[in-house]
Swiss-Prot record:
Residues 1-30 form the signal peptide. Residues 208-368 are annotated as: Serine protease. One of its GO terms (cellular component) is extracellular region. The keyword RNA-binding does not apply. Belongs to the peptidase S1C family. One of its GO terms (biological process) is proteolysis. PANTHER family: SERINE PROTEASE FAMILY S1C HTRA-RELATED, SERINE PROTEASE HTRA4. It comes from Mus musculus (Mouse). Keywords: Disulfide bond, Hydrolase, Protease, Secreted, Serine protease, Signal. This is Serine protease HTRA4.
Length: 483
């Protein structure tokens, strides 16, 4: 084809293009509408409109300019438009589109931001939800009715026994970093305060960790982290701080549930199936030991079912997860997660370097379901007595290890080894210390932790004989009464 011919075709094409009518495109129109309502150069909160009352379960969120606060749109509600109404957290504005009659811009519809993968979740109410968004939608409706919202307790349907699917994260080189990035926003730092008898001011007494299990502020931690008549302050990864109240506590399981009232919805962790965990699998422990937030340790699982009897807990029905992931003071209550980011345990106990234990997630799930059932029936937890000790019976192996580490360890063949005294507790007030050995309570010999538990349960006043190094001490303690 000649040059003149090509030039003629090009000219005809340009003329046809110029004669075509402009066709409005939704996203192009939406883009022009955003240009027509630019954000201010400087934010002046005094010029923000009065915030209307938001729908139940929805908190105010920053507008698209990050200046004023507006009511977010819930799932299925309109978003975008001339003023760019945002969606609630974890929702996105998308199709179907419609035109905003007030400004000519295009309105979208808020929908679930999660993908289809692993969408199905099981709620603490025993119902299977098609996605986290569906559960959140049901919870918003429940709050409007004054009903109790459900907590997501696992991935997959409620009737499923879990899967052994090897997630993609387990095949990546930076799998630890990927897990931490996913899990850390849901891990919280707990700071406990007590009132000084001299100044009558609240001073820090101890710290621990926990993790968020509901978007409205339910947090799981260890029971031994909490003590009676103390202020509990929760600090999120964002730095926001809230005062917490105790909702449920079980000292036998060493599990507790506390509640904060956040300004916005919180990121949650889902419980995996600890029964699916395999020996040799990588795990990651997160927490805030020594008040150092976002502390991460990793290790492998030695056994998934270290029975309480193996630890000398003859009457214990708990099977612990043993790992070499380091769990230090303050790490208690933090999550132990697999490489998919699912909670498979709660950091609980360190016996010695390289030997740590976690309460399995299946126990946590049952604890949450029992709490949910009690709330529905209007039953409050029973009052219990609390001493404030973490202890183990002196087995032969433990006795040999302690004598190897400490030549001054008491020359004793039986008793209960106190590996931690909870600060601010009745035990601490009585003078008990870490690494004491309890050999007698109220004139009765003590050889197992059950002996101590039964003595606390049956008596309002305890006379305790303790071995500390080469000393024999006589202490008295009155257990605390807690809910």
């Amino acid at each position: 084809m000649s040059f003149q011919r090509l030039w003629a075709v090009r000219t005809q094409f340009l003329l046809l293009w110029l004669l075509l009518p402009a066709v409005p495109v939704p996203w192009a129109e939406a883009r022009r509408s955003r240009v027509s309502l630019p954000c201010p150069d400087a934010c002046d909160p005094t010029r923000c409109p009065t915030l209307p009352t938001c729908s139940a379960g929805l908190a105010p969120v920053p507008d698209r300019c990050g200046c004023c606060r507006v009511c977010a749109a819930a799932e299925g509600q309109e978003c975008g438009g001339a003023r760019g109404r945002p969606c609630a957290p974890r929702l996105r504005c998308g199709a179907p589109f419609s035109r905003d009659p007030s400004g000519g811009a295009w309105l979208g519809t808020c929908g679930c931001a999660e993908g289809a993968e692993d969408a199905v979740v099981c709620g603490s109410d025993g119902r299977t939800y098609p996605s986290l968004c569906a559960l959140r939608k049901e919870n918003r409706a429940a709050r409007q009715r004054g009903a109790l919202p459900a907590v997501p307790v696992q991935k997959g349907a409620c009737e499923e026994a879990g899967t052994t699917r090897a997630g993609r994260l387990r095949r990546k080189y930076n799998f630890i970093a990927a897990v931490v990035e996913k899990v850390a926003p849901s891990v919280v730092h707990l700071q406990l305060f007590r009132r000084s008898p001299l100044t009558n001011q609240e001073i820090p007494s101890s710290s621990g960790s926990g993790f968020i299990v509901s978007e409205d502020g339910l947090i799981v931690t260890n029971a031994h982290v909490l003590t009676n008549q103390q202020k509990i302050q929760v600090e999120l990864q964002s730095g926001a701080r809230y005062e917490a109240t105790v909702k449920d506590i079980d000292h036998k399981l060493d599990l507790a549930l506390i509640k904060i009232e956040p300004d916005t919805e919180l990121p949650v962790l889902l419980l995996g199936r600890s029964s699916d965990l395999r020996a040799g699998e990588f795990v990651v422990a997160l927490g805030s030991p020594f008040s150092l937030q976002n502390t991460v340790t990793a290790g492998i699982v030695s056994t998934t079912q270290r029975g309480g009897r193996e630890l000398g807990l003859k009457n214990s029905d708990i099977d612990y997860i043993q790992t070499d992931a380091i769990i230090n003071h303050g790490n208690s209550g933090g999550p132990l997660v697999n490489l998919d980011g699912d909670v498979i345990g709660i950091n609980t106990l360190k016996v010695t370097a390289g030997i740590s234990f976690a309460i399995p997630s299946d126990r946590i799930r049952q604890f949450l379901e029992d709490y949910h059932e009690r709330q529905l029936k209007g039953k409050a937890p029973l009052q219990k007595k609390y001493l404030g000790l973490r202890m183990l019976p002196l087995t032969l192996n433990l006795l040999q290890e302690m004598k190897r580490q400490d030549p001054e360890f008491p020359d004793v063949s039986s008793g209960v080894f106190v590996y931690e005294v909870i600060q601010g507790s009745a035990a601490a007030s009585s003078g008990l210390r870490d690494h004491d050995v309890i050999v007698s309570i109220n004139g009765q010999p003590v050889t197992t932790t059950t002996d101590v538990i039964e003595a606390v349960k049956d008596n309002d006043f305890l006379s305790i004989i303790v071995l500390r190094g080469s000393q024999t001490l006589f202490l008295t303690v009155t257990p605390e009464i807690i809910n």
